[in-house]
């Protein structure tokens, strides 16, 4: 299993791959492929739980999913995404919630959707041995403020992201997620910091890339413009279910090999 230090050593040397997973089966599949990092994202809210956004995801839901993924993954670094309002209001509560993901559920690190308010928390978590990944740019938990739109389209906001990247690095963040920002800004952030940058809709100059699993394999009904579909699992699943229904309705399933009989039961009445 790679450590945070191993991941940092990859920056600028070898592209870092990160995918989301929300259950043990998916985590096992993703882990077997050799992906470097599995993010148990609060994207589960709209990816698999049927919500319109990530805001309804609870701490207990996240904890359950993190535990499942940690049990399914043997080699990848497992990062727990801290859900909306599970951090930030009170430092002690934030630390307890983040620590729970490592101590009770088996995560290796946590991720915070970041801003000026998370710099001090990142420093404190790092001091306590809780590796922390920062997330800048489009932060879905702020959807009611910013929407799901491109971020840092102007110079002032771009400078703020660059400053926040440096501040979170200084506070001890071990990596940065950069979401839906201009590629040339992401390149400048990557150049400005010594910790890995992992992009999603942020161009190819980041040290790594992350996407949502359901987008990658083609399970999502719709995907953001920066996602790429590499398979059609939704279609394959639908085909398999159609075949199952046809087999049951036609009497082809179950076959004799799918059940057993006991001779002594033949004379029951």
Curated annotation (Swiss-Prot):
Bias kind Basic and acidic residues: ranges: 252-262
Alphabetically ordered keywords of this record: Coenzyme A biosynthesis, Cytoplasm, Magnesium, Metal-binding, Transferase
Membership in a protein family: Belongs to the PanB family.
GO cellular component: cytoplasm
Catalyzed chemical reaction(s): 3-methyl-2-oxobutanoate + (6R)-5,10-methylene-5,6,7,8-tetrahydrofolate + H2O = 2-dehydropantoate + (6S)-5,6,7,8-tetrahydrofolate
A Pfam family the protein falls into: Pantoate_transf
Annotated compartments: Cytoplasm
Assembly, per entry: Homodecamer; pentamer of dimers.
An annotated GO BP: coenzyme A biosynthetic process
Keyword Cytoplasm (UniProt): yes
Pathway assignment: Cofactor biosynthesis; coenzyme A biosynthesis
Enzyme class, UniProt record, top EC level: transferase
SUPFAM superfamilies, alphabetized: Phosphoenolpyruvate/pyruvate domain
Organism: Haloarcula marismortui (strain ATCC 43049 / DSM 3752 / JCM 8966 / VKM B-1809)
Designated name of the protein: 3-methyl-2-oxobutanoate hydroxymethyltransferase
Entry function: Catalyzes the reversible reaction in which hydroxymethyl group from 5,10-methylenetetrahydrofolate is transferred onto alpha-ketoisovalerate to form ketopantoate.
EC annotation from Swiss-Prot or TrEMBL: 2.1.2.11
Requisite cofactors: Mg(2+)
């Amino acid at each position: 299993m790679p450590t945070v230090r191993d991941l940092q050593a990859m920056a600028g040397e070898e592209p870092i791959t990160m995918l989301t997973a929300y259950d043990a089966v998916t985590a096992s599949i993703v882990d077997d492929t050799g992906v470097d990092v599995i993010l148990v994202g609060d994207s589960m809210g709209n990816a698999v739980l049927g919500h319109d956004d990530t805001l309804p995801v609870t701490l207990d839901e996240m904890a359950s999913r993190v535990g499942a993924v940690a049990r399914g993954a043997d080699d990848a670094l497992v990062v727990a995404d801290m859900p909306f309002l599970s951090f930030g209001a009170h430092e002690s509560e934030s630390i307890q919630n983040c620590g729970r993901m490592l101590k009770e559920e088996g995560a290796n690190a946590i991720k915070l959707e970041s801003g000026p308010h998370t710099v001090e928390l990142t420093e404190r978590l790092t001091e306590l041995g809780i590796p922390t990944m920062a997330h800048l740019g489009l932060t879905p938990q702020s959807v009611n403020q910013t929407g799901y739109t491109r971020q840092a389209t102007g110079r002032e906001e771009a400078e703020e992201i660059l400053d926040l990247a440096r501040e979170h690095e200084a506070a001890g963040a071990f990596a940065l997620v950069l979401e839906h920002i201009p590629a040339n800004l992401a390149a400048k952030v990557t150049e400005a910091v010594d910790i890995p940058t992992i992009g999603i809709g942020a161009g190819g100059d980041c040290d790594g890339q992350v996407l949502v699993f359901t987008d990658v394999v083609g399970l999502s009904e719709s995907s953001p413009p920066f996602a790429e579909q590499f398979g059609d699992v939704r279609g394959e699943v639908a085909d398999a279910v159609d075949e199952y229904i046809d087999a049951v309705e036609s009497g082809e399933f179950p076959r004799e090999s799918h059940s057993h009989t006991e001779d002594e039961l033949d004379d029951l009445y």
